[in-house]
């Protein structure tokens, strides 16, 4: 009978989703807390200034509301601190091999042949108006050594979600205007 055992003492980072995926060759690709991650960012003892939000769309569109959004630069720093991960290959003998650079990795899936990774990362600017699934996103195919083989998509921040005629939400990228016809 086989038994379960710990492969690595390193801490997994599951802040943005499932931290591990099988490679198919008796190894895992996992998101780890970066080994050089420092202490949690500390808030300034007094506010730096007011937080002002302004709507400049020029129209009275309906807007979705969301709970638990980032509210300040300190929230941004906390989010980046805890969401930043280092991808690594973990063999069944416990060897951990880093893959690429650390970043805000929201997903990493191993290809069926175990040779490639589909990696989704988030980047700044963050928003105080929409949740993280609307933050700037890059989807890339990585080789197992972390080399970017191909960028499949780069999506900018989507701060405005318009409502279509059928009541469906339609994402509008920052700087883009909703076509009126």
Model-derived features: positions:
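Beta-propeller folds
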Residues: 1-181
